[in-house]
Amino acid sequence: MSLCRLLLMLAMCCGVSRGSQTLPAGGRRGQRRRDNSAQWSTQQRPEGAVGPAPLTDVVTAAGTRTVPDVDQAGAVLVRQYNLVTSPLGLATLGSTNALLYAAPVSPLMPLQDGTTSNIMSTESSNYAQYRVQGLTVRWRPVVPNAVGGFSISMAYWPQTTSTPTSIDMNSITSTDVRVVLQPGSAGLLTIPHERLAYKNNGWRSVETVSVPQEDATSGMLMVCVHGTPWNSYTNSVYTGPLGMVDFAIKLQLRNLSPGNTNARVTRVKVTAPHTIKADPSGATITTAAAARFMADVRWGLGTAEDGEIGHGILGVLFNLADTVLGGLPSTLLRAASGQYMYGRPVGNANGEPEVKLYMSVEDAVNDKPIMVPHDIDLGTSTVTCQDYGNQHVDDRPSPAPAPKRALGTLRSGDVLRITGSMQYVTNAELLPQSVSQGYFGAGSTMMVHNLITGVRAPASSVDWTKATVDGVQVKTVDASSGSNRFAALPAFGKPAVWGPQGAGYFYQYNSTHQEWIYFLQNGSSVVWYAYTNMLGQKSDTSILFEVRPIQASDQPWFLAHHTGGDDCTTCLPLGLRTCCRQAPEDQSPETRRLLDRLSRTFPSPP
């Protein structure tokens, strides 16, 4: 090998080696690769050179992460709660198939047995929706080894909110989320995720007013005893506790819009000396926590109307010491151990904010307050008043209702009811064409009621010749004789007749055509066809019919008129010099191009 060739090969190798080690301009050494698998829950704004906005001075701190500027709408709070009950025993000794514990899975579950410091009384009250992401239930037995003759079952119903009427073993096995335990055996039941998220991906409403129960709870959990616990050592019925139920629940909480929280305005908490006063009209409590609700225009002192359940009703939450709970009357202890009640603001003689207490929402609606035998001094305690419905007029104004559709603006499917006194006539001047006899009613006494929109008015208040059905003007016909004109309103089939003596419809043999209801031009009369006076010469009658759409055969639709020459009034406005209805050899070039384009756009069916 010559020396020149050897030097050339060495130069090529060195060049390749240097090229592989040299980074191009703007190399990526030291830069982190972007993780394309990351799931972004919020959309972060792009960062500029000096900050999120121009001319923003940025001051950072070493070792401190800047809070990102993101939209918090829909941010999800994740919390885990571990709840445990007191030792559970049979309420009725010797009973079988008894219910030890039953509760809907929701934020209203108590944080500790014996109190109602529930999940809702914590930060979850600031959110609108919750979702049970995971739920594990554990049974911890406390029975001695000598006790037997029974079994424990834990069962979960994902789509129910009430306990079954029978809790025998057949009912327990009707759900596939269950476990049956022998005496003294500990158990663990993990609820499958698909059972917790069976609707709306598991999201449930934190609010309970005007919300179906299945939309405010994730399901029902039941712990039952089957058989009779028997103490073989004493040869008698076992009367002690059987065990405890331990919950491990993982919750997700979210709001549907920023600031949509109960704690914003509608939840007021006051710590002060409080006293529940006994009154012949019901127990009351004077608290500054209710001052905000006294001035609300929605919180009237009258009774709630139908459909207004939850409006005008407060949730009154007490945070009392356990020592005080021992002195509460049983009537208060039944209301969530005396810590959560409902109230309605009443105000006292001194103008102080006062709330009347109730056991439930239904009692508050029906004004059936709690009765206590004497005043109860709560000492310095915390009372929280929150809007049970979270529907203040001041806080969340309701949108104005949409205006009603006018009676003459009809849609197909509208149901009209025409009521009044009618007379059977055969006078041609009072009847439209093709109607030889029928019932005639004066428009001032005939009431027309659109049952779909709720609009009701006399027939004479509408110019029926200008009425429309789905935007199409109704057909008008002349009278059989004379100058009267009638507006013809199409109906599906035969109008139903409702009279004082009976109901039905007129049937004419071999007549299958659609019917019509006729209104005189000024609405002064209503006419409908009847081939006989079977209702009598005069009758107070109602007719009921459904409006059908106006068909092409009902309205005089005409095809466009073409002259076939250069003076076509249909084609000239379209920019064509000659009529398109000409022989192909006589058509202008732009007409042929237009027809060719139309044939490609709208091809003829095969």
Swiss-Prot record:
Q: What would be one Gene Ontology cellular-component term for the protein?
A: host cell surface
- Region (particle formation): which ranges? 313-339
Q: Spell out where the chain is glycosylated.
A: N255, N510
Alphabetical keyword list: Capsid protein, Glycoprotein, Host cytoplasm, Host endoplasmic reticulum, Host Golgi apparatus, Host nucleus, RNA-binding, Secreted, Signal, T=1 icosahedral capsid protein, Virion
* Disordered: annotated span: 22-54
An example of a Pfam family matching this protein is SP2
Residue ranges spanning the membrane: these are none
Q: Where is this motif: Nuclear localization signal?
A: 28-34
Keyword Cell wall biogenesis/degradation listed? The answer is no
GO MF annotations in UniProt = RNA binding; structural molecule activity
Here the disulfide bonds are none
Renumbered to this chain, the signal peptide range is 1-19
Report the InterPro entries cross-referenced here.
SP2_M (IPR048802), SP2_N (IPR004261), Viral_coat (IPR029053)
Tell me the domain of life.
Viruses
Q: SUPFAM superfamilies from the entry? A: Positive stranded ssRNA viruses (SSF88633)
| Record keyword Secreted present | yes
| Other comment | The viral particles present in feces and bile are non-enveloped, while those in circulating blood and culture supernatants are covered with a cellular membrane (quasi-enveloped).
Family of this protein? Belongs to the hepevirus capsid protein family.
Q: How are the domains described in the entry?
A: The Arginine-Rich Motif (ARM) acts as a nuclear localization signal that drives the nuclear translocation of isoform capsid protein.
Instruction: Write down what this protein is called.
Output: Pro-secreted protein ORF2
